[in-house]
Amino acid sequence: MIQKELLEQYGAIEKRYGKSDVIFEVNTNAHYYYQIISGEVKMNNYNEEGKEFIQGFFKAGESFGEPPLFVNRLYPANAIATEDSVILVIKKDFFKELLLEHPKEALSIIENLAQRLHYKATMAAEIASEDPEHRVLQLIDYSINHFNLSKDENGYLVDFTRQQIGDLTGLRVETVIRAVKSLEKKRMLKIINRKVYREV
């Protein structure tokens, strides 16, 4: 995450989005860098039948939609606020100027993009598996290892809804629910007050 004060020095402003507000749409030009102060954003696509495919969820402290800024391409997905959100927005040219003058921040962006590429490559291979339980568990374990899920005496809290797990693994919600219950019986997951925990 780039420090808020530094972004503001280069002209970043705060913008507020309500739940379900569209931040940008697929196949539109990329003019800004976005970094979330509070709230949550999802990036998605829809196929010809109208089925939604989730590219990812982004939370406070995270940025999204950067790749087209560097290759002068159109956005490959939509960005939509999933809850009321406050987002720092800075024009592309000012953002690039910041990166040129602050190499540590540039390296941070590169590492962030590399992390996402690794995630997509890993999950693409796992989603090829036909076993729903395997898909769900791999998503959870990857998130534990790379996204700093919170941990308490019950294990790691899985900070995804059943719908989000389904969207990220290509499974129907009903299939996710059955898989989670089966994994609970196998003592690989815990369900406490409707929250899912990964056993440690």
What is each stretch, according to the model?
Residues 1-19:
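Short proline/glycine- and basic residue-enriched helix-capping loop/turn segments at helix->loop/beta transitions
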Residues 139-143:
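Short amphipathic alpha-helical elements of helix-turn-helix/winged-helix folds
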Residues 19-83:
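Cyclic nucleotide-binding regulatory domains
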Residues 10, 56-114, 118:
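Cyclic-nucleotide recognition modules
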Residues 38, 60, 84, 92, ...:
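ATP/adenylate-binding site constellation spanning eukaryotic-like Ser/Thr protein kinases
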Residues 145-200:
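Phosphate-/nucleic-acid-contacting segments
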Residues 96-99, 119-129, 149-150:
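Short helix-to-loop capping/linker segments positioned immediately adjacent to catalytic or ligand/cofactor-binding
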